[in-house]
Amino acid sequence: MKLKNKAILFSTVILMNLPLVTLSCKKITNNDFEELKKNNPNFNFIKEGIDYILKSVDSSLKEKEEINLPNFITKISDKVFKDFKKLRKINLENIKEIGKEAFSNTNLEELKLDSLNKLDPSTFLGCKSITKINAPKLETIESKTFQNYENLKEISLENVKEIKDYAFYACKLLKKINIDNVKKIGAYAFKYCYSLKNLNIDKVQKIEEYCFSSCTSLEKISLSNLKEIPNEAFSGCTSLNNIDLKNIEKIGSYSFMNNKSLASLDLSNLKEIGTSAFSNCYGLETVQNLNKLKEISEGCFYECTSLKNINLKNIEVFQLNAFSSCSSLETIDFAKAKSIGNNAFSKCKALTSIDFKNVEKIGNGAFLGCSNLKNIDFNNVKEIGQAAFYECKALTSVDFKKIEKVANRAFIGCESLTTINFNNVKEIDELAFSRCESLTLLDLKNVKKIGKKAFWNCTALSSIDIRNTEEIYDEAFSGCSSLVQFDLKNVKKIFKNIFLECEALKTILINGNKNGQNNNYKVIDGKQVYDKSNNSLIVDLS
């Protein structure tokens, strides 16, 4: 008990000897405010709550290259420093709000916006001298905020969640950027940022069209959370060589057009791809894992001249120009394909053989100019479009299993073609086999109609069977300079000049007879053919 009393007494003595301290929040008086104004005569400011708002400055400051704001200023009103063309440096670290056009048309070089959480697009309008921006609290970059800032080189925006349309459009020197937490990037946001090299946007969930278009120095980009790439998002990124698209489900039109440095792609989850998505990607060699894609769009891989390997076994439809001018493509698996669009594989000069398996329709010019294509199995093909195999110069044989009509110019210029099995073909259209210079024999016994110039300039052709042919159109066999004898059999209609420039042709027969006739025509001495309906001379070899 005595010990306790001593402790209390000792504490009391200590307290009595300490100075008295009063805790209080000093309220700024009018006198204090006037004192601030007096000490800062070049700055006109007001007080609202806890904030000091700069309303204007003395005109003499317009001649200054550097201005030091009083450290108590927290907000700057509209147009305060507008057209201060000599201004290069100002301390803005404590500023949490800046008005419209506050620094427009100044020559500021660096922005440290440590306290700013919102920025109007006009605040720094026309400040083309800015080279560096640090704004750690900003969450949104509004549309066109830094558009055409041609000297901007470095940006740190670690807290930004959204970058809107045209935000950094044509910032041609922008090289370093920290936007690690951004989730959405607007249209054209970084288009023409020629110096941008590497970019991590792993948290981005959505990007808009053209957002990185023509970023010609961009080499690497990480976008693991993205599911969809819109139209022209990376078009013209000619240095891009490292991009992971494994999680991408949809790629828009022209998204990677003219990306010359892309070498390989893994498209494991891709379900939809737009027009010309990878056209003119000259360095692209390999495309893997197209397991979920059913259709290759128009011009999708047009002029990917290095493309050698691509698994197409799950593709059902190939659209117009899908692989046109892929001059290194050697093999194609058409396991599930039903149709092949116009010019889909035209000028694929390395292709040597094709098994069409389930293909039923081949479009116009589909394999035009495939100059090394030697073997074709038409299997279930029912329709071949115009010029489908135009100038396939190495093609040696063709077997038409289910085809009933050979279209206009379908095999024109197939100069190595020696064997054709026409099977059920009923009609051969205009110029279909013209300039097939190695053809020697034709069995056309099931063909009803032979079109204009169908076999024009087939210079080796010497034997033709047309026993059931009903119509032969203009110049059908013109220029067949090896043709010696021709039997019209039971033909019903002959058009003019069917044997024009057939210099070796000496004899025309009807059913084996030099003086034979059928229901429509008669031949005299194997030299002259007359139309029996009007006794007009149709062919004259004399």
Residue ranges and their predicted role:
Residues 52-61:
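Eukaryote-biased recognition of intrinsically disordered, low-complexity regulatory segments
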Residues 43-47, 61-75, 85-97, 106-118, ...:
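Structural signature of tandem-repeat unit edges
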Residues 33-36, 108, 494-501:
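Generic detector of contiguous secondary-structure segments
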Residues 29-53:
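The feature captures the LRR N-terminal capping module
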Residues 1-31:
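Beta-rich interaction/scaffold domains
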Residues 36, 530-531:
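Hydrophobic alpha-helical membrane segments of integral membrane proteins
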Residues 78-80, 99-102, 120-123, 142-145, ...:
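Consensus positions within tandem repeat domains that build extended binding/scaffold surfaces
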